[in-house]
């Protein structure tokens, strides 16, 4: 192939002289490595490359080599580059480019996967040589350096040669490789797919070509394999200069792409700058890839800046290539290679300079911290170069005997997989290759007929650990873990699903994996096993499976849609046998919910749920989803047995054994009285299902745990803030039990923040401190706890302890991190924002042998469950949780198996504050309220509480909250303002001595003791008594006594002042004031405002002036249990569904709120819906326009918690999607059979798309929401996986096309519903209907108003304007359809008019369709006013009705004037008449109205223009007709202007009428009137100036009032008259503004009240809501682009639709409706 010769030429030119062993070895080492680094087999290569290549590739290669040599000379001259040198210097080439070949290979491979490749082999064999060369090239470059190192002459290039071979032979053959989906990410830099055929090369290109021609071809193949991920590489075409012959593959390659772009396509693209350095000159390019360095050594090794001159080099990750192909480059080499993405270099430099500047001025601690972060990042990047799994291979082997492998990289998602050269991977990761092939050939894959699934075997206990458990390292289970395994096995044999509830740290993960291993080996049950785990523990599960059960194939099902699709493609099932490949599937809750239909389709042999307390709420979506999965056995794994109630325990039992524990009521009745009588019966019932061991029973070797409560005073600043918070909230506090719970909770949160640190209340300004020392001192002095912690940490550091510090508040962790940096204590941090891989690294770094890390900061609740930090021996709980269970778990992270030292736990509590009281109460309350499963035989004794408490609630009621808030307040207020004492200086040893201390004893003494132990309280019964005595005393005092009056007064005065300022300040000043008062640093300001969702009048809240405008419509307490982020997600998902309140499960799934109960979700949903309705009602006075600019309509908004909701938008989305909700069956089985009831027009996608696909798309939108295209693609039941969102971004349908299509289909459904409704209401027969038509229509119109309204609402997405091409396509569609129509319509006795619904309606002899030729002529003539045509039906968003009318009028005048101009070239009246008609028909395609109507409207507009210009009434008096309307508006009179009889005759003669009736009776019987009502009614219907409902719209809108008998009078007037009129029009242009005032008035006068009442929803901002006149049938249909886009809904500006119109619309194919109008 061309590729070959190119390659050869490259080789020769580079001095390799290998003639062209295209097949691979030569090329492999050739382009880069052999020439430059000759590491591979360089000795033989460089000299004998010719011979090598000759021998390998044979005659083919020789002939090619000749050509290539000639080419070489030509190419090599201009750049005069030595190939090897250049190779080194241009890393981007480094990744061999195999573009053409790759492509071919891919195509072939694709085929191969289906055909097993045999045909392709033959077909591609010709090209294979060539391809292989290309492949080789690629490999050569990269791998060569590395791999081939001694491979010898023929294959000497090792990777290259293989790759070449790959490329060559396999290029053709490889192309068949089964597994390479076209669009996977490739690992090497993919060359561009298309090679230009032009033959011209620029110097740069040539240069590059020299080195990489071989590679490139190679790349091409790769490219295919890899997908188009990296389309840019070298700008050289490797085929062009070669022979002129082209094979079919080449043609294929080019035809899909734009040939002109090819050149750019061939350049490599920079994806990312990873690092920079000063390096040795020339130490760049391919020789710096990781594999080249391993083979040849690092060209930069031993470089010292001081001794030699260096240059700045950048480590570059190339787009489309994996990280092993990263190279070091200089700016110069990048420019030489003409790479794309150079803008990134500037950005990187800028950032780098900023960092350097910062480092210069930063303190040593900061620098150290920065360096640690860098180190972590570098470690992460190193992992990206390790192959974690191989998931596919190519069919063809390269010369070196290796296929290419599709690799998944460690730490990167599946979407980053890439194709790599086989030899390269084999050299480094042979173990992964072996694993891959053993997985592929494994016989131990799941099969349905496993007999133990149907009948469980007898249980045989395992006396000792079986050899298959423990993996290659022969790890041993502890005795209690073996017991646990036996218990799990016993439960399985008995058919009992169960709960493993061992305390944290006892190895539940290992026991579960051993159990699966037991099923696998003992009972040949190979799966599929589903493990659902939290993201935070996913990596540790993966690691443990690898360690303990390496024989089982575990796949991690995670990542974005691309990653998950790739897993389905490569890791899911064997394509031939259709048997599943994996044994274990690991996934997270979120992914499970996203892909529930896919994952739920499998029959699982086992489902295990880790951290199963997520399932304690049987009303949550996660619970409901998972319980529906088909499974043979279920296991719940939880370290925190049930926290709050018996109901939660029942939920878990019901989940595992729904038949046995079917009813909560029965369960409660049986065991609810347990508290009085003990729980013996419950224990007995639980025994088979629940296993709970605690550490102290099973792990005697575990060292003791000692906990101390350290109480400290507040600092002076804290006291001040604490009092301040209470004083400012005096009003709320004094309400006592009448106050709101959420109000108290918010105040309490503020006080808790204050107890932790003052910065949480008011962060300091950025420039507040002069130096680090001062900042550190201020930081410490702002919190009593931190003063103590500082002393404690210094002492612990001296002793060599390692510390875990827990806080609930992430912002507190920020402050602690800042403190640790000032103190230069090395630390790690983990909170919710730290993602999987970084999190894992931080843990590994902390636990590593000899780790320097002293502290680990953790948030109490962040995904830390199951995290092992046993290398720490001290735990500091900075602030206690409401729920002591969470603190227990926090402690367990250090006090767990593997711990060798005593664990000290320090709990910090602020004396005399809410914190202390919460702790006291929690001790007592939690013992009673929390279900603690103690040891009872295996299960432990239980303290159970029957009530079901809502998950989000706090454990305290209002009275208790009020009492807690009073605790300590009185003492505080005794210190005068400004004289608060600093806490006394105390020695840390003294503090520790005084602390309340308790060690854990071997076994609990009293019931609930384990829970109590954390509080160090010996006996809780005394506590209860104290409690009773204390309560009255504390509660008796009220807030007036506690807060001094002087302070209350001062606060009230301040508030009054603020209110006055608010009143007198201008809005702009007010805003400035707000900003100023919101002090300092931007970042902190936002933080300080964000009060954990609190709406209380807390300090900063009060400092801010009150917001103007309406008060918040919804009090905050209504949304307990939802954070602002969750509410935002909920609203976003809410807008995706029709009837969202009936689809809460789908909304919650989409919003990832599956843990919430349906009750909570319903409450929030109703809050959103009702809030929107109310806001729209309140705002019915009109739209608020943002910033006064047109186009931006900011509808009424309201707030839910901190989230602003656009009411209009939400309601409009709800209404737009309502037809879909009504049409799609809710029953899943019926839904599978759903077919769209309307005829649809062709989609014009790049794939076959039919009615079935439309139906599936609608079902997908129903199930997953509008816009969730990727979810729809993933659902196998919808069969759209291969059809939508193709990987090639240039292929349709992508998201934009799907949106357009969906909008169109939903409109069809809407019309269909309206039609059915109209039919339902139609009832009586024709004759009756005809007589009473007007009355009936009126009634129907009002009845159906609601139905139809949704028609006019904006579609969920606003489309961008369609471009000219689309317009042309539409025009063509119309033409072809018109042709079809003319064929289909039977001849009628009477003249007919073809309506948009393709129903014949008789009119006169004239037809309103244009033949193709006329249409084209009209199109050309009207091109100058194309813009006006497009805008005719599409007013800008946000215009008022008056402005919309004006807009349409102006467009009509422009269009009409242009038509008048066009007609001037004719003299023959007949011609003029004919062309006027043709042009207006053309115009009618752009709007709802037909040609006559438009012409008439135009004439009225002209008259108005004349009238406003001339201000004289002469015409009026002469033209008034008998039915003059007595309306003060002069314009109204105008509209009945000179109509002579001829005009009446031509449009609405009696003859026409009778024909119409006859025709109608004969042909259409019952449907007749509907037809006539449709969009183009017979014109007789207008003879009285009224529409089919007997409504006279022109009465309402003077502009268009006219006697419709006198239609088209212009056609019959003399030419003089016309020219006169035109003259007037021209004169009057520009004076049209006079109209607007009166129009508006008239408009509103005649507006019915019902219309106003609906003003709030966006669909009601209609265009001309009063003209109900003459709407064409497709009005509400997906008429035209204009229609879809108008925010005012699908109705044209010119009218509502009647139910009849709807009904007729859909009588026949909507396809015609749509396309006949759309041009």
UniProtKB/Swiss-Prot annotation:
Keyword Transcription on entry: yes
Listed GO MF terms: ATP binding; ATP hydrolysis activity; ATP-dependent chromatin remodeler activity; chromatin binding; DNA binding; helicase activity; histone binding
Ranges where the Helicase C-terminal domain occurs: 788-939
Binding residues annotated for ATP, in chain numbering: 502-509
Domain called Chromo: residue spans: 268-360, 385-448
InterPro entries: CDH1_2_SANT_HL1, CHD1-2/Hrp3_HTH, CHD1-like_C, Chromo-like_dom_sf, Chromo/chromo_shadow_dom, Chromo_domain, Chromodomain_CS, Helicase_ATP-bd
Compositional bias segments (type: Basic and acidic residues): 1-10, 66-85, 239-248, 1369-1380, 1526-1576, 1585-1673, 1698-1710
Domain spans labelled Helicase ATP-binding: 489-659
Pfam families to which the protein is assigned, alphabetical: CDH1_2_SANT_HL1, CHD1-like_C, Chromo, Helicase_C, HTH_CHD1_Hrp3, SNF2-rel_dom
Major localization listed first in the record, in broad terms: nucleus
CC terms in the record's Gene Ontology section: chromatin; chromosome, centromeric region; nucleus
Enzyme nomenclature, EC number: 3.6.4.-
Region listing for CHD1 helical C-terminal domain (CHCT), in residue ranges: 1410-1512
SMART domains per UniProt: CHROMO (SM00298), DEXDc (SM00487), DUF4208 (SM01176), HELICc (SM00490)
Compartments (UniProt record): Nucleus; Chromosome, Centromere
Chain spans, region Disordered: 1-249, 1076-1116, 1319-1393, 1503-1719
Regions of compositional bias (Basic residues) in chain numbering: 184-207, 1103-1113, 1327-1342
Similarity section: Belongs to the SNF2/RAD54 helicase family.
Protein name (database record): Chromodomain-helicase-DNA-binding protein 1
Organism: Gallus gallus (Chicken)
